[in-house]
A protein has these predicted regions:
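Detector for outer-membrane/organellar transmembrane beta-barrel domains
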Residues: 262-389, 398, 450
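Outer-membrane beta-barrel translocator domains and adjoining extracellular loop/strand segments
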Residues: 101-107, 138-149, 175-179, 231-238, ...
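Short sequence motifs at beta-strands and strand-loop junctions characteristic
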Residues: 109-113, 141-142, 195-198, 243-247, ...
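N-terminal periplasmic/intermembrane-space "pro-region" immediately following the signal or transit peptide
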Residues: 18-104, 445, 449-450, 454-458
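Outer-membrane beta-barrel "beta-signal"
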Residues: 308, 406, 436-458
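Outer-membrane beta-barrel pore domains and translocons
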Residues: 92-96, 136-138, 166-168, 222-226, ...
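Outer membrane beta-barrel
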Residues: 74-229, 245-261, 361-381
Length: 458
């Protein structure tokens, strides 16, 4: 390739000198008149040769040429745009139908609605950084920045770093977009501990893959602006993240083993901690207390979530397009601060902490089997317990769900879900279940993709 580049440069340079050689055969009378034009032609030829060499070198290295040289010709006209400079732009539509007999369980109360349209813009910025932007569009939040981060891909020592907003590396399913799940919604333990749409954070993330014991491991650590969203309608007298102890800190250790050519296992542990604004109530009235222009005064209380997750995958080499199996389980425990410190400026008021206390745990187990090239069946069992310190009554949620998943192509997905839920004690999910505390839900989902970002079948 280097010989080709050198030859191309010499040919162009030689072409630029041809007029200079022909000048020796001309008369001395007009040689001076043509000297300036020859010099300009030679300069243009040299510039063109340099441009060609740089473009060839950039092409051989797999990197885009300099933007100032793209589409520029000697005449000043603009040529074709280098496709390497164009980012990958895609969109994913997520449509959900709720046929639950007791009424819709969707946040907006709709029976059929576009839950979200996600627009992704992704590209390599230069040889050192990659940028990813994911925008979520829906009727409730309009346009929201779901993720926007810059990834450093050329750090020494095998490290990779991100800065911006990203999905927090807590557990297994929280690291996937909701439309990429093999279920319509996140498991109940993730929805309760991390949020209905999962947990994101804005800050710095560092990871590294290594294999000191003969199998692959990955360590991930993050520092973000705050741990999730504050309690709805609650504000503190000073920012939760005013001190470094108010930031959100997370860590995750992933372990990966190949059991055979057709199967592998992943076992991971993760934790996240930070402070969140939790409500305070007036000790005399027992209700939330608005003061000094705040809808409801709150206090910064520490909350920690720890968990472990397990994933087994099987896909035979001879039938990889038609058969596969996934078994996944995840356990989480939420630990809440019992008596957070009340800010000094609130000591003159009679306040009582009204946020979550103690700890509670939950888990899910999910299995998915591929029947044909495009058809999958799945089932999930959820359990979520409530801390008995919340109101003295205790409580739990148990759910069993079944799924039928169909991929017409790699750019579309159709899914049907049936879920039976039973609650006792504290109402955790559906506040209007009545004396039976049971609910049957029927959800339908259609997901489609435009562009390179598409639903993942496995």
């Amino acid at each position: 390739m280097h010989l080709y580049i050198t030859a191309a440069a010499l040919l162009v340079l030689a072409a630029g000198r041809v007029p200079a050689q022909q000048m020796g055969d001309s008369t001395r009378a007009d040689s001076a008149a043509r000297a300036d034009s020859v010099t300009r032609a030679d300069s243009i030829a040299r510039a063109d040769s340099i441009r060609i060499v740089r473009e060839l070198e950039a092409e051989s290295a797999g990197a885009p040429a300099e933007p100032s040289q793209q589409g520029v010709r000697g005449t000043g006209s603009t040529g074709p745009v280098n496709p390497r400079l164009l980012p990958d732009i895609s969109a994913v539509g997520d449509i959900v139908g709720d046929l639950t007999p007791r009424g819709s369980t969707q946040e907006d109360g709709s029976r059929f609605g576009v839950r979200e349209v996600e627009v992704a813009i992704q590209a390599a910025v230069d040889p050192y950084f990659r940028a990813d932007i994911f925008l979520g569009v829906n009727d409730l939040e309009k346009i929201a920045i779901e993720q926007a981060y810059l990834t450093a891909t050329a750090l020494p020592g095998g490290y990779e770093a991100r800065i911006g907003r990203f999905l927090m590396p807590v557990g297994k399913q929280n690291t996937a977009h909701r439309h990429d799940l093999h279920t319509v919604e996140y498991p109940w333990v993730i929805r309760s501990f991390l949020g209905d749409e999962g947990l994101t954070g804005t800050g710095i993330h560092v990871s590294r893959i290594f294999a000191p014991f003969g199998f692959y491991q990955e360590i991930q650590a993050s520092v973000v602006d705050r741990f999730g969203e504050d309690a709805e309608g609650v504000r503190t007298t000073e920012p939760v993240n005013k001190k470094l102890s108010g930031l959100g800190y997370s860590a995750r250790l992933r372990n990966y083993w190949d059991l055979s050519e057709a199967s592998n296992v992943e076992l991971s542990a993760s934790a996240i901690t930070g402070r969140k604004a939790q409500p305070m109530e007036c000790a005399l009235s027992g209700s939330l207390c608005p003061i000094d222009g705040l809808d409801s005064v709150g206090v910064a209380a520490r909350q920690t979530v720890v968990g472990v997750d397990f994933t087994y995958r099987w896909r035979p080499l001879q039938q990889g397009l038609y058969k596969s199996f996934i078994l996944q389980a995840e356990w989480m425990r939420q630990i809440n601060e019992d008596d957070p410190r009340v800010p000094p400026e609130l000591n003159t008021y009679q306040f009582r902490y009204a946020g979550p206390r103690g700890s509670r745990s939950g888990f899910y187990t999910f299995a998915r089997y591929q029947l044909t090239r495009r058809l999958y069946i799945g089932a999930r069992v959820d359990h979520l317990g409530a801390s008995s310190r919340d109101d003295g009554t205790g409580g739990s949620l148990n759910a069993q769900s079944a799924y039928l998943e169909f991929f017409p192509s790699e750019f579309s997905k159709l899914m049907a879900m049936f879920e039976h839920t039973t609650q006792s004690g504290v109402q955790l999910a559906f506040p209007d279940l009545g004396p039976s505390r049971q609910a049957n839900r029927i959800l339908l989902q259609a997901t489609f993709a435009l562009g390179p970002h598409k639903p993942h079948p496995f």
